[in-house]
Protein backbone atom coordinates (compact mmCIF):
# COMPACT_ATOMS: atom_id res chain seq x y z
CA UNK A 1 0.00 0.00 0.00
CA UNK A 2 1.20 3.55 -0.71
CA UNK A 3 2.67 5.39 2.26
CA UNK A 4 0.22 8.30 2.03
CA UNK A 5 -2.82 6.04 1.80
CA UNK A 6 -1.62 4.00 4.77
CA UNK A 7 -1.18 7.15 6.88
CA UNK A 8 -4.70 8.29 5.93
CA UNK A 9 -6.09 4.86 6.83
CA UNK A 10 -4.52 5.05 10.30
CA UNK A 11 -5.85 8.60 10.84
CA UNK A 12 -9.35 7.45 9.91
CA UNK A 13 -9.12 4.45 12.25
CA UNK A 14 -8.71 6.94 15.08
CA UNK A 15 -12.08 8.44 14.11
CA UNK A 16 -14.42 5.45 13.63
CA UNK A 17 -17.59 7.53 13.27
CA UNK A 18 -15.99 10.05 10.92
CA UNK A 19 -17.93 10.46 7.68
CA UNK A 20 -15.35 9.35 5.10
CA UNK A 21 -14.72 11.72 2.24
CA UNK A 22 -15.53 14.95 4.06
CA UNK A 23 -12.22 16.20 5.47
CA UNK A 24 -11.44 19.85 5.90
CA UNK A 25 -8.89 20.81 3.31
CA UNK A 26 -7.14 23.85 1.94
CA UNK A 27 -7.66 24.69 -1.68
CA UNK A 28 -4.12 25.33 -2.89
CA UNK A 29 -5.28 27.89 -5.47
CA UNK A 30 -7.34 30.09 -3.17
CA UNK A 31 -5.85 29.04 0.19
CA UNK A 32 -9.36 29.17 1.64
CA UNK A 33 -11.14 26.65 3.80
CA UNK A 34 -14.11 24.72 2.50
CA UNK A 35 -16.11 21.58 3.19
CA UNK A 36 -17.70 19.16 0.77
CA UNK A 37 -20.57 18.15 3.06
CA UNK A 38 -21.69 18.60 6.64
CA UNK A 39 -19.27 17.03 9.10
CA UNK A 40 -20.26 15.07 12.18
CA UNK A 41 -20.73 17.23 15.25
CA UNK A 42 -18.59 15.01 17.42
CA UNK A 43 -16.03 12.31 16.73
CA UNK A 44 -15.19 9.41 18.98
CA UNK A 45 -11.40 9.16 19.07
CA UNK A 46 -9.76 5.86 19.95
CA UNK A 47 -6.41 6.34 21.69
CA UNK A 48 -4.03 3.93 23.35
CA UNK A 49 -5.22 5.26 26.72
CA UNK A 50 -8.89 4.64 25.89
CA UNK A 51 -11.50 6.58 23.99
CA UNK A 52 -12.64 10.17 24.14
CA UNK A 53 -14.95 12.49 22.27
CA UNK A 54 -13.77 15.44 20.23
CA UNK A 55 -15.05 17.73 17.51
CA UNK A 56 -11.76 17.41 15.63
CA UNK A 57 -11.76 16.30 12.02
CA UNK A 58 -9.03 14.50 10.05
CA UNK A 59 -7.23 16.49 7.37
CA UNK A 60 -4.84 15.39 4.64
CA UNK A 61 -3.34 16.61 1.43
CA UNK A 62 -0.84 14.94 -0.89
CA UNK A 63 1.44 16.83 -3.25
CA UNK A 64 2.47 14.28 -5.85
CA UNK A 65 4.98 16.64 -7.45
CA UNK A 66 7.04 17.17 -4.27
CA UNK A 67 6.13 13.81 -2.66
CA UNK A 68 4.97 15.57 0.50
CA UNK A 69 2.08 14.41 2.65
CA UNK A 70 0.26 16.64 5.12
CA UNK A 71 -1.90 14.86 7.63
CA UNK A 72 -3.39 15.98 10.89
CA UNK A 73 -6.53 17.23 12.56
CA UNK A 74 -8.61 20.41 12.43
CA UNK A 75 -11.15 21.82 14.84
CA UNK A 76 -13.34 24.88 15.16
CA UNK A 77 -12.52 27.25 17.98
CA UNK A 78 -13.61 30.70 19.17
CA UNK A 79 -10.56 32.93 19.12
CA UNK A 80 -12.18 35.52 21.38
CA UNK A 81 -12.25 32.92 24.16
CA UNK A 82 -9.67 32.60 26.89
CA UNK A 83 -6.20 32.03 25.33
CA UNK A 84 -5.81 29.05 27.66
CA UNK A 85 -8.72 27.33 25.90
CA UNK A 86 -7.03 27.91 22.55
CA UNK A 87 -3.83 26.34 23.88
CA UNK A 88 -5.81 23.41 25.28
CA UNK A 89 -7.34 22.81 21.84
CA UNK A 90 -3.92 22.93 20.17
CA UNK A 91 -2.60 20.47 22.77
CA UNK A 92 -5.56 18.15 22.11
CA UNK A 93 -4.80 18.19 18.38
CA UNK A 94 -1.10 17.63 19.08
CA UNK A 95 -1.93 14.63 21.26
CA UNK A 96 -4.00 13.19 18.41
CA UNK A 97 -1.02 13.66 16.09
CA UNK A 98 1.24 11.94 18.63
CA UNK A 99 -1.19 9.03 18.73
CA UNK A 100 -1.08 8.90 14.94
CA UNK A 101 2.74 8.75 15.05
CA UNK A 102 2.57 5.85 17.56
CA UNK A 103 0.30 3.96 15.19
CA UNK A 104 2.53 4.77 12.22
CA UNK A 105 5.50 3.42 14.16
CA UNK A 106 3.58 0.24 15.04
CA UNK A 107 2.81 -0.23 11.32
CA UNK A 108 6.47 0.28 10.34
CA UNK A 109 5.48 3.41 8.42
CA UNK A 110 7.89 5.65 10.28
CA UNK A 111 10.80 3.96 8.48
CA UNK A 112 9.44 5.35 5.19
CA UNK A 113 9.51 8.96 6.40
CA UNK A 114 12.74 10.88 5.86
CA UNK A 115 11.58 14.39 6.79
CA UNK A 116 8.98 15.57 9.29
CA UNK A 117 7.62 18.78 10.82
CA UNK A 118 4.61 20.07 12.77
CA UNK A 119 2.60 23.09 11.66
CA UNK A 120 -0.08 24.88 13.67
CA UNK A 121 -2.35 26.93 11.42
CA UNK A 122 -5.17 29.29 12.37
CA UNK A 123 -7.93 30.47 10.07
CA UNK A 124 -10.26 33.21 11.28
CA UNK A 125 -11.81 34.02 7.88
CA UNK A 126 -13.67 30.77 7.33
CA UNK A 127 -15.15 29.80 10.65
CA UNK A 128 -12.39 30.11 13.25
CA UNK A 129 -10.47 26.92 12.64
CA UNK A 130 -7.22 25.59 14.02
CA UNK A 131 -5.19 22.85 12.36
CA UNK A 132 -2.27 20.86 13.69
CA UNK A 133 -0.65 19.29 10.65
CA UNK A 134 2.25 16.94 10.28
CA UNK A 135 4.24 17.44 7.11
CA UNK A 136 6.05 14.35 5.81
CA UNK A 137 8.36 13.62 2.95
CA UNK A 138 7.36 10.07 2.05
CA UNK A 139 10.14 8.15 0.33
CA UNK A 140 7.79 5.62 -1.24
CA UNK A 141 5.13 8.04 -2.43
CA UNK A 142 4.66 7.20 -6.11
CA UNK A 143 4.37 9.91 -8.74
CA UNK A 144 0.89 8.75 -9.74
CA UNK A 145 -0.81 8.55 -6.32
CA UNK A 146 -4.14 10.25 -5.75
CA UNK A 147 -5.29 12.66 -3.04
Model-derived segments and their meaning:
Residues 62-78, 128-142:
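Oligomerization/assembly interface segments of phage tail-like spikes and tubes
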Residues 52-54, 76-81, 141-147:
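Short, cysteine-centered beta-strand-loop-beta hairpins and adjacent loop/turn segments enriched
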Residues 47-49, 69, 76, 80, ...:
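Alpha-helical context
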Residues 57, 83-86, 122:
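Residues at structural and domain junctions
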Residues 15-21, 37-38, 42-44, 90-139:
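Acidic-leaning, charged glycine-interspersed low-complexity segments
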Residues 1-61:
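Small/polar-rich, solvent-exposed N-terminal microdomains that initiate assembly or binding
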Residues 79-93:
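Short histidine-centered catalytic/ligand-binding loop motif
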Residues 56-68, 97-98:
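Phosphate-binding glycine-rich loops and adjacent basic patches that engage nucleotide phosphates
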Amino acid sequence: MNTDKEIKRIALEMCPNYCYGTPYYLNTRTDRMRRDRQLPACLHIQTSEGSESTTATPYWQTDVRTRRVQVGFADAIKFDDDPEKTLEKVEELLSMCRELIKRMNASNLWARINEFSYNVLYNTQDGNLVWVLMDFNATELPRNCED
